[in-house]
Structures are given as structure tokens and as C-alpha cells.
Amino acid sequence: CLGASWETRATPSSWNGENNTYMGYCTDITTNDVIFGGSKKLEESIEYIIANKNPKGIFVYETCVTAMIGDDMDDIARRMQKKHNISVVIVHSPGFVGSKNLGSRLGGEAVLEQLIGTREPETIHPYGINLIGEYNVTGDMWQYTPILEKIGIKVVSALAGDGRLEV
């Protein structure tokens, strides 16, 4: 599933740090992993990303093969999250469950279930809004955000376009 993902994520980002938008890290599941399990590879991959990229969080996508193996990805995520004190979000979205739109929905539901509500904002803007389902595919968000700001509306967060994981 990941083989053709390099540089296909064209959604722009305003992030000033290292842009990993184009990166798609993977566990490189082999036939032996399918037979004997891939838990160790997933843990090693998460450890590698944490050691080399120092992320605020990691999203792990369950693909067709990993779903069929049946490894307890949620348990791995909980252990890695506790060990490293970062969010590790599991998105159960194997391709055989449905369309790309369903995959996007499953990703959004994972964020809602595993991230939203884990902390409150430091300040609350009286006219703050959250954009849900905004993908900023061609940078269109950057066109209307200034208009909203001119009329006193502040975009507090965006799911999933030009969003950030603040923990």
C-alpha cells in the first residue's frame, strides 16, 4: 500500500519546521512477518521515528496485510505512548473495508476518539472555530482564513488540512 506514496501527498503545509508531509514511513512487512507477526517491526519503526524525528505524535495506519495478521496495534500504541510520552494514534483503515472516503472518515474518527478532548486550550477565543474536513489541498485555506480573521473569527484548529498536533 505504501510503495507509491512518496511525494504523492500534495497538501501544502505552513509548518516552518522539517516538512515530513511527503514521507511515508513503513514497517516493510515480509512473508515471515505475516506468518509470525509484525509487532516487533512496528515497535522498532515507532522507536526509529521517535529517535530520528522527535515528533509530537505518530499516526499508524493499519493496512490490509497488517489487519489480516491480527497484531494488537492498539496495545503497541498504548505502550509506545506511555514509554515516550507522545500520542500514538492507530487508524484502523485497511483498504478492504471500503473506499478512500471511508478511509478519510476512519482517520477523522481516530483523531476524535484518541486526541480530541485530551487537553483544553490555554485561551478561548470568543469567536473561535474548528474546521473539520478541511484538507487545504491547494492552499485554499490560506485564502479564506484572512477573510475570517478580518471579521473577527479565529481558526483555532483544522482537521485535517494544515493542522498541528499540540500536546
Q: Can you describe what each PLM-predicted range is?
A:
Residues 1-167:
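An N-terminal assembly and electron-transfer interface module characteristic of large anaerobic redox
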